[in-house]
Amino acid sequence: MAAKDIRFGEDARARMVRGVNVLANAVKATLGPKGRNVVLEKSFGAPTITKDGVSVAKEIELADKFENMGAQMVKEVASKTSDNAGDGTTTATVLAQALIREGMKAVAAGMNPMDLKRGIDKAVTSAVEELKKISKPCSTSKEIAQVGSISANSDTDIGELIAKAMDKVGKEGVITVEEGSGLENELDVVEGMQFDRGYLSPYFINNPQSMQAELEDPFILLHDKKISNVRDLLPILEGVAKAGKPLLIVAEDVEGEALATLVVNTIRGIVKVCAVKAPGFGDRRKAMLEDMAILTGGTVISEEVGLSLEKATINDLGRAKKVQVSKENTTIIDGAGDTADIEARIKQIKAQIEETTSDYDREKLQERVAKLAGGVAVIKVGAATEVEMKEKKARVEDALHATRAAVEEGIVPGGGVALIRAKAAIAELKGANEDQNHGIAIALRAMEAPLREIVTNAGDEPSVVLNRVAEGTGAFGYNAANGEFGDMIEFGILDPTKVTRSALQNAASIAGLMITTEAMVAEAPKKEEPAAPGGGMGGMGGMDF
């Protein structure tokens, strides 16, 4: 086992604080409407330019191991806040730095670290309660657009695009962000259930303009096995032909004789058919077929439930108003399933979302909910260069997370005002002893830090602005974009409650741990062994070359 380098007490804490300050100073430069950009070197390709706090934090590694530990702990604040609420990373870092800086001073002055931590925790718990009281629900399109704009660094186009997407697919709907091909941002909305499987044969195409197979009012056959024998399909094909309707077949695969027969029937116009593979794999495929069955009012023909293809009748098939099948995707629009059944299925999937621990599974389950609930919106981000595209895409994703958080827990006045109001409401809070009172005072002082930093970045005097905001009430605050004072909600400067709450809680959590640190252990630096001197063979002097 390698030797360790151990630091204690004041020496350990001072090094840790140096690391915290390096990271926080780089991150906090990005805060507010007049925050600056940070340029990040990449090992290959052009550097990345960003105004996103968590992107800056993730890039920082320090040479000194003890300083690096401090920086990494604050990085955890930023990434945790980003994971929880999708935004507020810079605010969380600024709060953590303020708490740590003041807390370390108090520890150096001889106060009890545990009591300081208890005081900070008490103040934060009360402040969170106050934030919940100040919070207003975020329901209108205008408010959603404002939250999105603020999170996307005051880009109103992005805010409006997100509000439009939420209008189209509902608050529960899935909104994805992709890189577009033009200069403008675009919004594509896919109504109904879409999955990423296309037609099995181009002969199924019946609309040469769009190169799609379009089926109006079709029957839908759902099967979880391969179909290769045409005899299995005959009873259903005859029933569908009698009804004079088209047929969509969704199965694990359709091959050989069965596929050839379907193609011939389609070309001759006997029955209009299109066959596609079922989406997903394994258990997820079964679940998605079941979703389709509920959406279309049909049954999955599966041996597990005692149904076989040759015994299936037209009554086992699902129905929909329209189906569009392209080379890559299939979209089922307006399925004929019972609304109560669909809602029960959504409820069931939401329960699974609550229980799952895997981010990947959660994302897939949320997609399934959206497909059942009514659609998927795709925001295509446009930009002139790849560097701008990456930066813009990151901002759109941030804004999307923030608007979801706002819909979930409501909104508070932005620009650091909510924390000032929460601070005023708990100004009289007292702890069990003097050290706890000092911990409370540290937390109250730290709650001013985001507003101070926004004002500093805008080039104004923080103390003057802070006093003016503190004298006001409600949503009265300072608009750093134009230097005006007024109602933050009317200015459209809003923060999701969840973002402000998560930033404060995560900052206090890490600050409490760092204040109560007494020793730090790191790998001792290895001594470089001097290289052996190079030598030739002896007795070779005087040779002429």
Curated annotation (Swiss-Prot):
Keyword Membrane: no
PROSITE patterns: CHAPERONINS_CPN60 (PS00296)
Entry keyword annotation includes Chaperone: yes
Reactions the enzyme catalyzes: ATP + H2O + a folded polypeptide = ADP + phosphate + an unfolded polypeptide
Pfam families referenced in this protein's UniProt entry, alphabetically: Cpn60_TCP1
Places the protein is found: Cytoplasm
Principal location: cytoplasm
EC number(s) stated in the UniProt entry for this protein: 5.6.1.7
InterPro entries xrefs: Chaperonin_Cpn60_CS, Cpn60/GroEL, Cpn60/GroEL/TCP-1, GroEL-like_apical_dom_sf, GROEL-like_equatorial_sf, TCP-1-like_intermed_sf
Top EC class of this enzyme: isomerase
Annotated residues for binding of ATP: 30-33, 51, 87-91, 415, 479-481, 495
CDD domains: GroEL
GO cellular component, one term: cytoplasm
Gene Ontology terms for molecular function: ATP binding; ATP-dependent protein folding chaperone; isomerase activity; unfolded protein binding
GO biological process per UniProt: protein refolding
Biological role stated in the UniProt entry: Together with its co-chaperonin GroES, plays an essential role in assisting protein folding. The GroEL-GroES system forms a nano-cage that allows encapsulation of the non-native substrate proteins and provides a physical environment optimized to promote and accelerate protein folding.
Similarity field: Belongs to the chaperonin (HSP60) family.
Protein name: Chaperonin GroEL 2
Protein's gene: groEL2
